[in-house]
Amino acid sequence: MNGMSTGTLVLLRHGESEWNALNLFTGWVDVHLTDKGIAEGKRAGELLLEHNLLPDVLYTSLLRRAISTANIALDTADRHWIPVIRDWRLNERHYGALQGRNKAQVKDKYGDEQFMLWRRSYDTPPPTIEPGSEYSQDTDPRYANLDEVPLTECLKDVVVRLIPYWEDTISADLLAGKTVLITAHGNSLRALVKHLDGISDEDIAGLNIPTGIPLRYDLDENLKPLNPGGTYLDPEAAAAGAAAVANQGGK
């Protein structure tokens, strides 16, 4: 770590989940990793080892796909023993009534423009999910202490819940010089990268984060990136993975 750098931040999107493979909107639905997703978690751990990027503390969401990916990666990197903090504010964006629906079918039914608004606009949430329905989380015990469980979210809602947690909690570990691993989701990580890199509400629509490839940020004492945009530990695979994410909704 150079003299100007504070902590090192590593962002990791969970490996491929069962619903990623089926091209379904997932959101807060708690699905398992596929075999490919498990392999991605292992590869992430190998990349951490190869780059001697050894986390001191782990933050994850409350969702199995992020927890499992982190466990596999840390076990592979021989860092399975580090402290772990899990928080709902790192959860994926809640996709409302779209949860459990096929992306290509939603696109066909509502058209490209509406599909992209729901999927990528900053402040247009999908329709709300019916409380008590199959893919709603309003009675899930892990959210019992929330005043209100979301019924839908746009990316702006994720920013509003996540950035105070970043500033109040995660930042302290980075300012103490720790290497912090955050294993989370496409949209919670997009919200954080938007904040770190000062990306506009419009331009964030074009940012896609691939599954299973660690993204390193070196931060100064104000937690501003010394390497804006971060550095993927496998840039070639990251570019291919981001392109695949951008194309979701295709047949």
From Swiss-Prot:
Substrate binds at residues 13-20, 26-27, 65, 92-95, 103, 119-120, 186-187. One of its GO terms (molecular function) is phosphoglycerate mutase activity. GO terms for biological process: gluconeogenesis; glycolytic process. The active site is at residues 14, 92. Its EC number is 5.4.2.11. Keywords: Gluconeogenesis, Glycolysis, Isomerase. Pathway: Carbohydrate degradation; glycolysis; pyruvate from D-glyceraldehyde 3-phosphate: step 3/5. It comes from the Bacteria. The keyword Isomerase applies. It catalyses: (2R)-2-phosphoglycerate = (2R)-3-phosphoglycerate. Signal peptide: none annotated. InterPro entries: His_Pase_superF_clade-1 (IPR013078), His_PPase_superfam (IPR029033), PG/BPGM_mutase_AS (IPR001345), Phosphogly_mut1 (IPR005952). The record marks 185 as: Transition state stabilizer. HAMAP family: PGAM_GpmA. NCBIfam families: pgm_1 (TIGR01258), PRK14115.1 (NF010713), PRK14120.1 (NF010718). Belongs to the phosphoglycerate mutase family. BPG-dependent PGAM subfamily. PANTHER family: PHOSPHOGLYCERATE MUTASE. Catalyzes the interconversion of 2-phosphoglycerate and 3-phosphoglycerate. This is 2,3-bisphosphoglycerate-dependent phosphoglycerate mutase. It comes from Rhodococcus opacus (strain B4).
